[in-house]
Amino acid sequence: MQHLNELIEKAKLAIESIQDRSLTALDEIRVEYFGKKGHFTQLMQELRNVSAEERPAMGAKINEAKQAALEFLNAKKTEWEQAELNAKLEKERVDVSLPGRKVETGGLHPVTMTINRVTKFFSELGFSVENGPEIESDYYNFDALNIPKHHPARADHDTFWFNPELLLRTQTSGVQIRTMEKMQPPIRIMAPGRVYRNDYDQTHTPMFHQIELLYVDKKANFTELKGLLHDFLRAFFEEDLQVRFRPSYFPFTEPSAEVDVMGKNGKWLEVLGCGMVHPNVLRNVGIDPNEYSGFAVGMGVERLTMLRYNVTDLRSFFENDLRFLKQFK
């Protein structure tokens, strides 16, 4: 029994002598005394040399001594772990009285803001949004829109072609054709989306956004078109603008016009194109042009955004410069 007490004291002394409360050193002592080859384990193995009558009592004493030493070790381990945690927390302590970090909120891209502004205006007038594929067929992008085979828009330097029949759409007009094929008049839709043209400079990018309008009914006329666009432009720019319609040419409308607004510098600025849907386009989708008429409008979203916010370089919208984008929050 005296030998067991000495072993307990020896274990306690070894634990107390550990420098800097090292948990690694403490674990080494655990292995030395309680491991497979530890002191207490060896004592248990020596019981085989003790007589059967003395073995139970001797085994109980060894277990009691082992438990006392182990409890001392575990108590130290818990104490040191808590001290280590407290030191770590103290080191990482947060001063809750300090002002918090400013969290910046995101905002809509100016192009998205314009799309939302335009679609909101026309949706309140009964126009619904229709979408179509960006990889379009030659038929829907050109043929059905009365664009002749020799038209320059079909050339490789203006259009991104995949093969002789498939291309990246140059306009969202294909959505108008697809809608007229599946719907009967009256039709009142808008088609926002990305379009692609092989051009890149201060006022052109290879990809840009367009919104087209289509209205088909028995009484659609140019006077109604003019009134609609007057109201839209004044609402969009929030000014009582001067608006003028200039005769123009588009293969898919007849008559056709380009629409200008008077800028602050006293000069006319082109904002969109429009016209009455060409009878051939109506025939291509099975609508009788003798019974129905319609008008169409096409506007470049980036163009409208540049004019509304006085942006001079179209490419700024696609450079993701936060210094530029923050101005539109």
Swiss-Prot record:
Task: Cite the PROSITE patterns for this sequence.
Answer: AA_TRNA_LIGASE_II
Q: Name one GO cellular component term.
A: cytoplasm
**Looking at the keywords, is Metal-binding present?**
yes
Superkingdom per UniProt? Bacteria
Q: Name one GO molecular function term.
A: magnesium ion binding
Q: What class of enzyme is it?
A: ligase
Q: Where in the cell is it found?
A: Cytoplasm
Instruction: Provide the reaction this enzyme catalyses.
Output: tRNA(Phe) + L-phenylalanine + ATP = L-phenylalanyl-tRNA(Phe) + AMP + diphosphate + H(+)
Q: What is this protein called?
A: Phenylalanine--tRNA ligase alpha subunit
Entry similarity comment:
Belongs to the class-II aminoacyl-tRNA synthetase family. Phe-tRNA synthetase alpha subunit type 1 subfamily.
On subunit structure and binding partners, the annotation says: Tetramer of two alpha and two beta subunits.
Q: Which residues bind Mg(2+)?
A: 254
Details of cofactor binding = Binds 2 magnesium ions per tetramer.
Q: What is its main location?
A: cytoplasm
Q: Which cofactor does this sequence's record say it needs?
A: Mg(2+)
UniProt KW keywords:
Aminoacyl-tRNA synthetase, ATP-binding, Cytoplasm, Ligase, Magnesium, Metal-binding, Nucleotide-binding, Protein biosynthesis
